[in-house]
Amino acid sequence: MKNILVKGSGDITETREFFDFVVDKARENYMVVICGGGTKISAAFEKAGYVIEFDSLGRRVTRTWEERMIMRDVLEHEEKGLQDKFVGKGVVVISPILYAGSTLCPINGDDLVKAYELGFDEIYVFTTQERIEKKKAVFRNFPKVTVLAI
């Protein structure tokens, strides 16, 4: 039995290919899925009137409590949707939100993959065809990470 981590962008996690891959791997392994939601977070920020900004490391910049709440709400919605989808399949779903005490710390899902890398035997990051080269560059120094596009 292996420890397997899968991170799926919010644009991918609703696909049948993603679901089948995760369920197949979960049959014989311990499976953790990190949900994404970048596109949906951006849409929610725009709807609320916020400018979407990223830092030099590609992480979303949040300056206000409300922005962090928007991120949290989107990610928790994605997490709950995936949990419902994988009920009874032996899959643990988490969102990229950390808490330091009671302080909410949304973290980029790719950064969370890097942080968890030491504890997993296999890691898969799912993205879109349009983003695969960028995603491969993000993980080029992480040999356990396999980037897949749907």
Task: Describe the residue ranges of each PLM region.
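Nucleotide/pyrophosphate-binding catalytic subdomain
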Residues: 1-150
